[in-house]
Amino acid sequence: MGQKVHPIGLRVGIIRDWDAKWYAEKEYADYLHEDLAIRKFIQKELADASVSTIEIVRAVNKVIVSLHTAKPGMVIGKGGSNVDALRAQLNKLTGKQVHINIVEIKKPDLDAHLVGETIARQLEQRVAFRRAQKQAIQRAMRAGAKGIKTQVSGRLNGADIARAEGYSEGTVPLHTLRADIDYAWEEAHTTYGKLGVKVWIYRGEVLPARKNTKGGK
């Protein structure tokens, strides 16, 4: 089943944390739709800023949004102009006070979302799908990945019948829950239709923090 389960969802609560941290009862649906609107708006406004993860934490009439990006300078802008404009737009969208935290991704070649995004953009620029995948794998392994697997599916090279083709290097232990595996999928919009891009990156093992029990044991 490790091949079929979402690698991140399988590890939430073990070595991964939730991307949205809040609790609600009657307002649950409203908050969920608001989260989706925030994420969609940020992804549209910062499409070229290499934004990977968007974390949302809620307090009373306050929303804290943490943006993980490989290009913090582009998100912040000159003198903070871009982030101020983004904050004002999110305040208007949600009707609440929004705080924005910028978190820099120091190794973008180890982030599955950014690697998948790079492959997708290359496919849109008519780069050969095998070359795009192999280059991404080489960069990830040089950056310190223990293993990486990529897959591109769809009408490859304009073929009449859609198929999937992938490459891998190193190990990607999907069944090991303590394995830090980052996973993402992206879409490339080509003249022959959409191509799907999937990326799995194994970054090493993480031992879950031992929880304190009563009695200090």
Swiss-Prot record:
UniProt cross-references to HAMAP family, sorted A to Z: Ribosomal_uS3_B
GO biological process: translation
Keywords recorded for this protein, A-Z: Ribonucleoprotein, Ribosomal protein, RNA-binding, rRNA-binding
Superkingdom, natural source: Bacteria
Family (UniProt): Belongs to the universal ribosomal protein uS3 family.
Function: Binds the lower part of the 30S subunit head. Binds mRNA in the 70S ribosome, positioning it for translation.
MF (Gene Ontology): mRNA binding; rRNA binding; structural constituent of ribosome
Coiled-coil features, chain-numbered ranges: none
Gene Ontology cellular component list: cytosolic small ribosomal subunit
This protein's name: Small ribosomal subunit protein uS3
Organism: Streptococcus thermophilus (strain ATCC BAA-491 / LMD-9)
InterPro entries from the UniProt entry: KH_dom (IPR004087), KH_dom-like_a/b (IPR015946), KH_dom_type_2 (IPR004044), KH_sf_prok-type (IPR009019), Ribosomal_S3_C_sf (IPR036419), Ribosomal_uS3_bac-typ (IPR005704), Ribosomal_uS3_C (IPR001351), Ribosomal_uS3_CS (IPR018280)
